[in-house]
């Protein structure tokens, strides 16, 4: 919202009286919004699978848990890219301590680096599964 709200401001040192008049600004906004939407779609799908298992009173299978891990890693990657793009659009003022955009960006970047979201391990485990190899990367209760 902060980015959209600032779209009426000028692009300094350019001919654009409003940021939204610049095609590059609109393209970046569209790219970031598309990544946020894709991440939401991924997580909605993952949550639906979790809800179905819970309603059936069954634990997720190892394959379903791997799906959750790799899909969450993909969603986090998309959101990380989107938040970085939005901060680029906000410019240096977006990083002011008083800026909500900076606070959200910082909190997301710290939280997304929690060990449970380790994309490298999740992607390696999923790749191992795709190859049909024995799962030796994650303990069974962590898959």
Placement of each model-derived feature along the sequence:
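Alpha-helical structural motif
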Residues: 25-28, 35, 42, 71, ...
